Amino acid sequence: MKRLLIILLIMNFVLGLQLGAVIDDVFSREEEPQNILISNKERLSSFDHIKENQIKVSDDKVEIDLDGRKLSWSRYTGSNSMDGVLDDGHNGLEFIPETINDIHLGDIVAFRYDDRLIVHRVIGLEYDEQGWYAITKGDNNIQPDPGKRRFKDIKFITFGIIY
């Protein structure tokens, strides 16, 4: 009899945990991507440049308050270096950085390199004898991009991607 009571208590506890998870999933407004096939190691992702209170959604439009920042639009090409995030034909919303404080680890930036605009992720922020610089890398590239990205080279910071 004692064993049966213990088993029933354990089953009740487990059922309560499962029911709590289901209720949380049903009533939560946050979406949480699940990663069940590969490591849950944290990877760099973009800084939250736009806060929830800066976004207004109505039936037929989305408004984003950029706090006076200068806005740009971009259409990406398919180089495969940022596949999974950016691909051929995707549209990006970008703002022009005003200071180095606008640029964060994980941000996707467009920078000038050999007369081209390259769009890669910031993986390092450093200082040397010439001052501040960023290290960039395409998400699917093995090595970081050659050279240092000085502030003058970084033209845009991506804050939204429209698929």
Report each predicted region and the residues it spans.
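Extended hydrophobic leader/signal-anchor segments used for secretion and membrane insertion
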Residues: 1-163
